[in-house]
């Protein structure tokens, strides 16, 4: 089975490099993901997120449109090897034609400014998955990791002993928001997304928001790049109850290669990331939710380089490690892509 990855931030990384005057292109670059690395990694489909840091731009909508323009340009420049998909049949057509597929997503629903018309405009531009929020509260709801609170925790930690500093930072990282969920506008967005056939992504969302999405929807949804909280207690990961609920709905969570979402190191120590840690999360998620709820969500180009999974061309190393840990090839086929493709087939319009 070829790789189907639900999340990377490569388009945002490329635009940042271009603004620095670098000759950054999707065909070949120094990022985690490019066409050549994907070919070596045997990819079928990559979700390309248009990620916008809401507090870094005066007009987040303008920024997401700049990212969309670059994505469109790169798809045209690389049309021999990869093509965008809007429907399930597009994926099948690309596969039959020997081309990889690209699915356009947006990471930060706040770019719409609460406008359902802008949400529909994104859909018209080809966006088929939306991560409702990143690490700030927005007009749609609340995240579990709030960058404003992180800054306050780190400032407070600087004035404390190492033990107390670690306690403060861990308290921030490991305490989920079980009270603040979706706003009324967020509820309307979730309902409109399900109506459109746009996949709802709950990665980054507060626990309260997750359960609201569960109650508001009927179709499967995803946590495109989230791991298991029982293995690494950071609240960017899903609790066992959330994993079971996601699985019962037919949803999928994507293994995230971010080292800090895989293991927690002592305060101040560098976390390089290991394949063994990814395997631990995979085994736990499958034990809790079953083999059907697990996929891939690397977070490539949105994270520091993982020491053992340095890019899209290294995916075989993870396959081999998972196989050595006891996963069968049939189970690996499901993790590598079949589970995500099953969900796409169900949610995306024909």
Where are each of the predicted segments found?
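Short catalytic helix/loop segments, enriched in acidic residues and glycine
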Residues: 19-40, 319
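A metal-dependent hydrolase metal-coordination microenvironment
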Residues: 30-32, 37-116, 120, 132, ...
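Structural preference for beta-strand elements that scaffold enzyme active sites
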Residues: 2-5, 45, 101-105, 128-129, ...
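Active-site beta-loop-alpha junctions enriched in small/polar residues
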Residues: 9-11, 51-53, 87, 105-109, ...
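Mid-to-C-terminal alpha-helical segments outside catalytic/metal-binding sites
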Residues: 194, 310-350
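Short acidic/histidine-rich active-site segments
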Residues: 256-257, 288-312
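Histidine/acidic residue-rich metal-binding segments in metalloenzymes
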Residues: 114-124, 148-222, 235-249, 276-294
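Conserved, mostly hydrophobic/aromatic
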Residues: 7, 38, 87, 126, ...
